[in-house]
From Swiss-Prot:
Gene name of this polypeptide: MP
Subunit note: Binds to host RBCS at the plasmodesmata; this interaction seems required for viral systemic movement. In resistant plants, interacts with host MBP2C at host microtubules; this interaction prevents virus cell to cell movement. In resistant plants, interacts with host resistance (R) protein (e.g. tomato ToMV resistance protein TM-2(2), AC Q71BG9) at the host plasma membrane; this interaction triggers host defense responses leading to programmed cell death.
Organism (species): Tobacco mosaic virus (strain Korean NC 82)
Protein name: Movement protein
Family in the record: Belongs to the tobamovirus movement protein family.
GO BP annotation list: transport of virus in host, cell to cell
Amino acid sequence: MALVVKGKVNINEFIDLTKMEKILPSMFTPVKSVMCSKVDKIMVHENESLSEVNLLKGVKLIDSGYVCLAGLVVTGEWNLPDNCRGGVSVCLVDKRMERADEATLGSYYTAAAKKRFQFKVVPNYAITTQDAMKNVWQVLVNIRNVKMSAGFCPLSLEFVSVCIVYRNNIKLGLREKITNVRDGGPMELTEEVVDEFMEDVPMSIRLAKFRSRTGKKSDVRKGKNSSSVRSVPNKNYRNVKDFGGMSFKKNNLIDDDSEATVAESDSF
């Protein structure tokens, strides 16, 4: 199976297959189809927002099957002048889960002075095709101490995922094939790590409060179509701590108009 898509996200960073599994026909291996999604964007206009994100954009799903979200690459761009103060916390959410601590899949913090940032998450769990079609993932964004007039966009986020689609769970054993991201920097951070360095309020608690204020699903907005006015920035400012050690590779990015890529697609 050809698992590296040139000029795209490196699938091998998320899925660890043996040499035999890479060359065997699909009938002899449990992994049937590995895909990279199209890029989905969120334009952040508010200091705190919960937006839907399509992590399976352009991915061909199997009727009555499953899809495993093996990996996720998030790229952010601050639309600000250099050396601005403040920062942002970004949290990936599974909106199906009622308990906020179980709904948060991973969170990350970065300073506004870092103009472009990129981090990776390995969710490593599967959902049914029926659930996937309901767009179950959201992104909770909390911007702090960025002084920008209302109505403008201080931050843009782009998402691309690596996923595996399959028809049956029997003999899949995919969890044994998932590896951790091998970069030395803090590309994948659990909420505990982020809270230790930066957060006064954990993102799971922030999510619970946000849901209680707005209603869990009724007020969630599409990221790209959001035209709401940004709320007034929080005046309680704390010094931003920079994690450092970020690794940014240009060849890991996917162009805006790129198509979803099938690394290997065989009969199911």
